[in-house]
């Protein structure tokens, strides 16, 4: 881990807007981008495509070691483009089914260990914006700036509903709310790297904030670090 390279760690629950915010910040700062949650989605997606059972730790660990992925910051609702083995998979890994699979494989210690060094390798000059569930607590505990971005479960369900409806999906908002609550409980209760703010993280509740307001708030904290924004 290159501690000399500046970085911003953004953690928080599903649907809090971490990916969009991280992508916009990476573009603004001109830094590298890491979407930790997408790595688990990518692994779950690849596992299904390769016929690997999502409970098979050894097979998943081997598959994780060969994931060829790039995150390209973009100025849109995703905040990024995700390239897996040369193919863009930004949208196809964002289904609720893949998300559930990602949460399932993320609970496996061997899988988390396999992806840990991969994630740390993203910390290269001129800097890194990393978002996930344990960036500030496990992956980059020495990050100089840590943000824990959250929002109410109801607001996160509303945002996800509007996002899916805009894509023409037939979704039920109450079902999305239930899924988010279940995922929150699973992620916060898991034995390995449970979802929680780092002791030195700045808590940011975006329930009544626009994406632009969230970005500007974090930029203010970046300025306080003396970073060129």
Curated annotation (Swiss-Prot):
It is found in: Cytoplasm. Its EC number is 2.7.4.25. It catalyses: CMP + ATP = CDP + ADP; dCMP + ATP = dCDP + ADP. ATP binds at residues 12-20. The keyword Cell wall biogenesis/degradation does not apply. InterPro entries: Cytidylate_kin, Cytidylate_kinase_dom, P-loop_NTPase. SUPFAM superfamilies: P-loop containing nucleoside triphosphate hydrolases. The keyword Aminoacyl-tRNA synthetase does not apply. GO terms for biological process: nucleobase-containing small molecule interconversion; pyrimidine nucleotide metabolic process. GO terms for cellular component: cytosol. Its main location: cytoplasm. Keywords: ATP-binding, Cytoplasm, Kinase, Nucleotide-binding, Transferase. GO terms for molecular function: ATP binding; CMP kinase activity; dCMP kinase activity. PANTHER family: CYTIDYLATE KINASE, CYTIDYLATE KINASE/PANTOATE-BETA-ALANINE LIGASE. Belongs to the cytidylate kinase family. Type 1 subfamily. This is Cytidylate kinase. The gene is cmk.
